[in-house]
């Protein structure tokens, strides 16, 4: 017997590790094939998206497809990703991280509203896979942003305006899912 369980009390699931992006991704498989197939599909998509995103980011930064292929393979299949995929689908779903960084770099180097909107959308996707992912990518993204901003003193105002657009897009996309936590 324990005094730590209270039957009949309500507990909010707002702070539970929901993964709206994985839910929407796997929903068709869930409806047609069941829970196991949906989980397997979401897990497989996490590996594919991680490899593809890292490939594109590395190709953008280095310009070499061979190095990009290696980076995509290593990023997608490093041991921590396998371990997380066994028990924490939300934490194993980090494939949108390199896509966010890719669009941030593209938006800084060749500013356009479209690039900043994609940057904001991919940051939001990171958050919708797992709020942890949004928090984990911020320090590296801010460091990369600062380096790129420092290299382009003439474009700083334009870049900061674009980053504000990206932040607003990310907030607008995430707000309906985060509202219960506020």
Residue ranges and their predicted role:
Residues 32, 61, 77, 81, ...:
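Transmembrane helix irregularities
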Residues 136-170, 180:
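Perimembrane helix-loop-helix junctions
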Residues 100-117, 123-126, 147, 151:
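Membrane-interface transmembrane helices that cradle and orient dolichyl/undecaprenyl
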Residues 55-77:
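Transmembrane-helix signature of polytopic, membrane-embedded enzymes
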Residues 53, 94-110, 140-142:
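Specific aromatic-rich, kink-prone transmembrane helix
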Residues 1-2, 170-182:
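Aromatic-rich transmembrane-lumenal/periplasmic boundary elements in polytopic membrane proteins
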Residues 1-50, 76-94, 98:
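Membrane-interface coil-to-helix junctions
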